[in-house]
Amino acid sequence: MGISDSHSLSAVRRTVWCAGWPGVVVAVLAACLTLGRGGDATAGVLGPSRPSQVRPPLAIMNIALSDEGSGGLARLRQVPPSPTVFQAQKLLRDLGHYRGVVNGLLDEATSVAVKRYQRRTNLEVDGLISEELVDHLEFTGQAERLVERLSEVRGEQVARARAALAAQPETRNLLVGRAASESANPTRDSAACLAAPNVSCLLEEALEAAKAVHRVHFRDWVLGEILQLQARLGRDDAALETAARIDDPRLVMAALGKIGRAQARRGRWQAAGATARLIPDLRVQAGVLVRLVAALVEAERPAAAYDAARAASALLERIPAARARLDLLSDLVLALEPQSGIEQPLVLRALAQDFAARALAAVEGGEPGVRRRVAVLMARRGRPSAALELAEGLAEIDQRDVLMADIALAQARRGQDRAAAASVAQIILPRYRIAALVRIANLHSAAERRGAARAVLVRALPEIDKIAAKFTYARADAGNRLVHALVDAGEREQAQRTAAAIADARLRADAHWRLAAAAAQAGAPGAAEAERLSLDLTRSIGSALDRAWTSCNGARLGLNAGVQGLAERAFDLALKTVRGIANPWARAQALVRLAATLSAFE
């Protein structure tokens, strides 16, 4: 066979030569090869030399190069290029690992490039080229091209967002991005705030902690969390000031959307409309208007809701992305339909039907994801039959399972319990079946139908064991959901057994806080012990941020149950935990959570 370089020679030398009983050779390989290229090529014959000590039934023989000479075996001097090597060289060059000639010949430079690539990608370093290596190179190349394209798209989006904000005098001052130039005060002492906390000082401490977050993306993230709480509390000026600290102009745009939606939820409709008009991004602006429509419908202001819906609809026509248009159109339909039993005015019903018809018409286009999105819309509108008809065209299990859960809930709302049970039975993945059954049980509990809720939960409990053991978090999450639903249905003993089986420390602690709040609310004899167990489980959580988060959740659960003392003790544990958090990003996140929880006490 022809071999073109020393690398291949070393590969041949590693060949294992096997013989049978002593003196009987069962496999002998001789190979003709050339070393080098062109007129300096050296030709030779490779074969077995001396045998090693034979141990029946096999003998291992070494190999050696013999009959070396130049100019002989001329037919071996022109080795044909390998398509596999050619492709590997091209891919290595594209990835910046190879600068040699792309000729399909495995020379020393190619071998060095292969080894370099193998080292950097944690592959076995042997310098050999195979179909598997070429596949790996192609995958890596595609991934890098995707990253490059995403980077290009991000740059284009940032530039457009910056230009759009700069084009308006009202939003130009939001492009300052002061946080990048601000530095945290190393001598700052937060002890006074944490000793006697209030919402304002906790938010101020969170902003100070954010200054010490050096990675821009994470800093922008936590600033967005701070801003959202400020907006929710009605502190618009402070929220806008925080928005000006955000570096990424796209997130500045999103921040304005958060402010506008918060204003709508608080019933500040004129302010929400004014904020929406400030937002250059049409999707974000339309999202604020959709939230404004929902708030106006709930406030029984049909004329204003109609005008806002028409304004949102006009914006949709200007959004180029079809999927984004459909998502917003679906949200607009649901916003027009009251969720709290308020009778829908005829003018809004007609508008919702018109928008729903437009959504159904989009299915005819056959765009990916449209059928599922419209089916979900029909289910959430309480049209399970239409949703089931659309579901027939869905092939992906996850998409179909989520849709069937929505359909089952819609049927349960209509009192169609058998139909709801049949829809749940069509859900393939057990974690989705549990989620659907829990939602139906919660629906019954909220309507004081606890017997019906218990019957549904009896069906849900065995489903936990059907979730594969490797999905530990999914099993724990399902168990936690069931604990909350069981407590609402009045099944505290079963809830305790379910909570004890939860493997995830954070979710187990959360489940026990729900049990402790329920026990305290009922004045049960074991209420104090239940609270102590919740505190101990929370302290055992490894992550300080998770401990603070879980403690705050416990405080919220206590407040929801009307158990002030438990809520205060849970909050005190969160406060103590935050004092020990040194990481600026985690500290800022925890402080925001503390501020949000404390605001619920007021």
Predicted features by range, described:
Residues G2-A195:
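Cell-envelope/ECM-targeting effectors and their regulatory/trafficking segments
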Residues F139-E602:
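Non-catalytic tandem-repeat scaffold regions and their flanking low-complexity/translocation tails
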